[in-house]
Amino acid sequence: MTVKPEGRKMLRIEKKNAESPIEQKPRWIRNQVRTGPGYEDMKSRVTGASLHTVCQEAGCPNIHECWESREATFLIGGDKCTRRCDFCDIATGKPAELDRDEPRRVAENIQEMDLNYTTITGVTRDDLPDEGAWLYAEVVRKIHELNPNTGVENLTPDFSGKPDLLQEVFEARPEVFAHNLETVPRIFKRIRPAFRYERSLDVIRQAHDFGLITKSNLILGMGETAEEIEEALRDLRSAGCDIITITQYLRPGPRFHPIERWVRPEEFVEHSKLAKELGFGGVMSGPLVRSSYRAGRLYVQAMEARGLELPENLKHLAETSQGATAQEASTLLEKYGPSEETPVTTRMAKTPAQSNSVAATIR
């Protein structure tokens, strides 16, 4: 990606961010590629049918593990977002006209890939009267129609917190409704200026009250403290959040918020313990965990925590949710041993021709 955003002027905050060189990663943020028959089969299906997933296009470090479990993520609503968050690489601008055939195509892609579980995420569409609520609901309906054995997670924007718009999305009944809080109250406005902390919590609360399994995400390393992380976890749990993922912020490029701190694996383990003590049914915590990482596994755990049986058509998900997960902090500690506090050091930012940055998190 280039330093200058495509099709618009740099914002003042982007110019300030660009003054800080790109940071060097500590030794524990490394990804070893492991492929198996499930991944190879998925790859051949995707390549042969010219399908597109966020997993490929964002260069996700977890693609091999998730595809091995036949899980994949799709981005809907276009490639431009009407809001800008300081950690997210999705372009901000005026989106293209709504593609009303997209839900059918996504559902057919999932059918072709024979997925066990899929996460649907997308851009915020403040330009539309319903802010994209129909699209997020319709894609779930189409997936369920064509793929009754595929679990669906719907990771949505906040729809301005409007109950009627959220109700439309809820009524499509995804297996999991997700809305990412991302950060703590003190720095929320700086990181997510078009969102509101309390409104995001209320979105989770409304989904919980509707009866859905709910999920959210926290990104660490943007300036928050341990006490503030605990506060956010408590707030989410009080709102009825069932599943939490906790991850390290990785800066997509020079225009984005500088990394304030590398969070050690030991700290991720402590955050995971706290989340479980607070009553989250599904917890995944580690530097390279992403909000859709091993999502089917977390859904199974959340259902068990609620004392609910998996639907007959999704009982196969229990089989794919066994064993260790490569990106969980506890796994990293077993692999690398204890880690030392690593100060944030920088390297020179790449030129546009050299740059190969990808989104740290997709909201």
Swiss-Prot record:
[4Fe-4S] cluster 2 binds at C81, C85, C88. Residues 352-363 have a biased composition (Polar residues). Its cofactor is [4Fe-4S] cluster. PROSITE patterns: RADICAL_SAM (PS51918). The keyword Metal-binding applies. Keywords: 4Fe-4S, Cytoplasm, Iron, Iron-sulfur, Metal-binding, S-adenosyl-L-methionine, Transferase. It catalyses: [[Fe-S] cluster scaffold protein carrying a second [4Fe-4S](2+) cluster] + N(6)-octanoyl-L-lysyl-[protein] + 2 oxidized [2Fe-2S]-[ferredoxin] + 2 S-adenosyl-L-methionine + 4 H(+) = [[Fe-S] cluster scaffold protein] + N(6)-[(R)-dihydrolipoyl]-L-lysyl-[protein] + 4 Fe(3+) + 2 hydrogen sulfide + 2 5'-deoxyadenosine + 2 L-methionine + 2 reduced [2Fe-2S]-[ferredoxin]. SUPFAM superfamilies: Radical SAM enzymes. Residues 67-281 form the Radical SAM core domain. [4Fe-4S] cluster 1 binds at C55, C60, C66, S292. This is Lipoyl synthase. GO terms for molecular function: 4 iron, 4 sulfur cluster binding; lipoate synthase activity; metal ion binding. GO terms for cellular component: cytoplasm. Belongs to the radical SAM superfamily. Lipoyl synthase family. Its EC number is 2.8.1.8. The lineage of its organism: Bacteria, Bacillati, Actinomycetota, Actinomycetes, Mycobacteriales. Binds 2 [4Fe-4S] clusters per subunit. One cluster is coordinated with 3 cysteines and an exchangeable S-adenosyl-L-methionine.
